[in-house]
């Protein structure tokens, strides 16, 4: 059985956009670079040709990876979720119990996780510690950087 990948609708759209760009913009551009480099003659010592072939290999690998993830996507419409328990798709406001600093994280699938955008993977130590907890609860997260304690201030569905 094929393992489904949980993904938000926006995460699915972002991966679809990347796939379309790689197929319709990057692929033709790389093929053009290969043809141009090939026209320069001897391929054995043609650095431009080898660089273009390497770029092609990288691009095709990413296309295959994106096609696989999109085919296995289990799209979850976060706007239809509710409740005060943390689960996939929840946006959670945390307060660091040591520093009192607030942090807001949305729990998403691995393919769409991006800490800079406030999105953490459901498989991350923080998300695993939060799943099933409610607002007002305290959690301890054991991560590579050491243990941290947080209070769950709010659970939202955006």
Swiss-Prot record:
Necessary for efficient RNA polymerase transcription elongation past template-encoded arresting sites. The arresting sites in DNA have the property of trapping a certain fraction of elongating RNA polymerases that pass through, resulting in locked ternary complexes. Cleavage of the nascent transcript by cleavage factors such as GreA or GreB allows the resumption of elongation from the new 3'terminus. GreA releases sequences of 2 to 3 nucleotides. InterPro entries: GreA/GreB_C_sf, TF_GreA/GreB_CS, Tscrpt_elong_fac_GreA, Tscrpt_elong_fac_GreA/B, Tscrpt_elong_fac_GreA/B_C, Tscrpt_elong_fac_GreA/B_fam, Tscrpt_elong_fac_GreA/B_N, Tscrpt_elong_fac_GreA/B_N_sf. This is Transcription elongation factor GreA. GO terms for molecular function: DNA binding; RNA polymerase binding. Transmembrane segments: none annotated. GO terms for biological process: DNA-templated transcription elongation; regulation of DNA-templated transcription elongation. NCBIfam families: greA, PRK00226.1-2, PRK00226.1-4, PRK00226.1-5. Belongs to the GreA/GreB family. Pfam families: GreA_GreB, GreA_GreB_N. SUPFAM superfamilies: FKBP-like, GreA transcript cleavage protein, N-terminal domain. It comes from the Bacteria. PROSITE patterns: GREAB_1 (PS00829). Keywords: Coiled coil, DNA-binding, Transcription, Transcription regulation. Residues 47-74 form a coiled coil. The lineage of its organism: Bacteria, Pseudomonadati, Pseudomonadota, Alphaproteobacteria, Hyphomicrobiales.
């Amino acid at each position: 059985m094929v393992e489904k990948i949980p993904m938000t609708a926006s995460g699915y759209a972002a991966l679809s956009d990347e796939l379309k760009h790689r197929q319709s913009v990057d692929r033709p551009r790389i093929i053009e670079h290969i043809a141009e480099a090939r026209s320069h003659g001897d391929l054995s010592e043609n650095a431009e040709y080898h660089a273009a072939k390497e770029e092609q290999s990288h691009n095709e690998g990413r296309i295959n990876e994106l096609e696989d993830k999109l085919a296995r996507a289990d799209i979850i419409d976060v706007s239809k979720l509710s409740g005060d328990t943390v689960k996939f798709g929840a946006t959670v406001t945390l307060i660091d119990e040591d520093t009192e600093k607030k942090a807001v994280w949305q729990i998403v699938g691995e393919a769409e996780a991006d800490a800079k955008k406030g999105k953490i993977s459901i498989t991350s130590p923080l998300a695993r510690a939060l799943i099933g907890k409610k607002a007002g609860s305290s959690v301890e997260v054991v991560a590579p950087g050491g243990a941290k304690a947080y209070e769950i201030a709010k659970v939202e569905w955006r």
